[in-house]
């Protein structure tokens, strides 16, 4: 993953729990330094180690830490780093999600060898099925946080009704069934 991701995780922990907790997370992770270049690609294991250490230090399940991080990514990092692109991507949550792949296409030109996840939206009566397809595994809780963060951004309450894993050869394909109501 790119340094931007690791820097965002660092930022979240520092803002919500303080510098001392970040130093504990860093020590517990075994990651030798916390100076990540945003545009540089780092081994995914570094990010997973930091998330695991955050779980250990903060006394929260890894899934809860990843969900919190997904919300932070949308509300803090992406908003600051890509605010104008986010604003242009949609006026409501579903419109935004439908444009997410195009948004990733624009960002892809900035990062070498970047293979973003894909999102597809289907209406299901009053609910929506949001397909998340990625080469990476283990990030479904992060996506839940992304969805909840987008809900906050667009003034919409997001309720995850179900998560269904679709069998794929490599990576992850998860269908999130969500209900959206005005907040």
What is each residue range found by the language model?
Residues 1, 5, 61, 138-146:
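Short amphipathic alpha-helical segments
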Residues 1-33:
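Charged, compositionally biased N-terminal leader segments and the immediate start
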Residues 12, 72, 146-154:
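Conserved short hydrophobic interaction patches
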Residues 17, 29, 58, 151-155:
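A broad structural signal for alpha-helix termini and local helix breaks/kinks
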Residues 20-57:
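Long amphipathic alpha-helical segments
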Residues 32-38, 73-77, 169-175:
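Short, mixed-charge aromatic SLiMs
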Residues 47-140:
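Amphipathic interaction/junction segments at domain boundaries or subunit interfaces
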Residues 111-131, 136, 140, 144, ...:
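Short terminal or interdomain "cap/linker" segment that borders an active site or interface and mediates
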């Amino acid at each position: 993953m790119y340094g931007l991701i690791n820097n965002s995780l660092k930022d979240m922990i520092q803002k919500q729990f303080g510098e001392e907790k970040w130093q504990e997370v860093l020590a517990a992770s075994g990651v030798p330094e916390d100076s990540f270049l945003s545009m540089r690609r780092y081994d995914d294991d570094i990010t997973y180690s930091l998330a695991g250490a955050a779980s250990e230090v903060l006394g929260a399940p890894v899934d809860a830490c990843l969900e919190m991080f997904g919300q932070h990514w949308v509300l803090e990092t992406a908003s600051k780093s890509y605010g104008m692109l986010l604003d242009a991507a949609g006026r409501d949550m579903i419109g935004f999600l439908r444009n997410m792949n195009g948004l990733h296409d624009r960002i892809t030109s900035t990062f070498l060898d970047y293979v973003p996840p894909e999102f597809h939206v289907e209406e299901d009566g009053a609910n929506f099925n949001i397909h998340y397809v990625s080469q990476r595994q283990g990030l479904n809780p992060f996506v839940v946080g992304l969805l909840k963060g987008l809900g906050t951004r667009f003034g919409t309450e997001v309720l995850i009704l179900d998560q269904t894993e679709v069998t794929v050869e490599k990576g992850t394909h998860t269908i999130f069934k969500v209900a959206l109501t005005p907040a």
